[in-house]
Structures are given as C-alpha cells and as structure tokens.
Amino acid sequence: MSQQSSLSFTSSIDSSLLVRDVAGSYRPAEPAEVLQAALRVLEGQLRGTEMLSSPQAVRDFLRIKLGTLEHEVFAVIHLDAQHRVIEYVEMFRGTVTHTPVYPREVVKEALAHNTAAIVLVHNHPSGVAEPSRADEHLTQTLKSALSLVDVRVIDHL
C-alpha cells in the first residue's frame, strides 16, 4: 500500500486508533491495546514526578491499572525522600472480596527499592469503596512495621 493510499485509508477510519502489526501494516487497535498505551503514558508521567502535586494523575493511573479487575489487588507506590515516584508494584492478588497482605513482604519490598515513603493501594471490585475494619487494621499494622525501617506511609487508597 502506498503512502498516499495509506493516508486515505487512515482518514476513512479516523474514529479508530491504529497500531502497526508485525508485518508493518496498520490495523485498528484492540481496546486492551489502547488501555495499555494509556497506562504506559500515565506511568511515564507518574514516574519521577512530585506525587502529592498531581493527585489526579495518581487517580487516573490507578483507575486504569485497577479499575477493570475482577479480583482484589494490593499494590504500593514507592516514593523517594522528595516524594517522587520510584515504582508502582502490584504485590498481592486475591478474590473478589479479599486479598491477603503480608507486612513482612511489604517491608522487604520497601527496603529493596530504598523507599523513603509509600502509598498503599488496593481496589474494591465488589463496588464498596469504604474501608472496612480489616482495611483500617491493615493500614495501622503496615504503618507500624514500615516505621521500624523509617518508611513513612503517605496514604492508603
């Protein structure tokens, strides 16, 4: 296909995003590919940024990362001493209503990333976003464990 005919083909389906396949041809992107591309952009914007100055970017990132999952995931966002993002890590996966979280593993992960501060994250695929007593207890347990190694918990979302 010539560049001229390629351009007319593209304009005829301008409502779709296109991706290049392994043969070099363009085809409409699958929804999962669009989400992956958006996630890569948001991860790039989030990494190395001032975490607390862009709460909307964090919400957008987490909505794309966790919003469509049918099971609970517990993740952490590692921050440096200036609260810039070091890394986002999904640590534990569970069922639709529960995911086991092991404080020892969270502490090990924080030390491995040389984390100064951390944001704790988990989704609620059941639709109930209010923190349960178990969530509140877990937050306190993790705060206590992480404080022993000088890692400050910024938030639990």
Feature map (PLM): residue ranges:
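Active-site-proximal loop/helix of nucleotide/amide-processing enzymes and allied scaffolds
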Residues: 2-35, 57-60, 82, 92-157
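Long amphipathic N-terminal alpha/beta scaffold segment
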Residues: 29-91
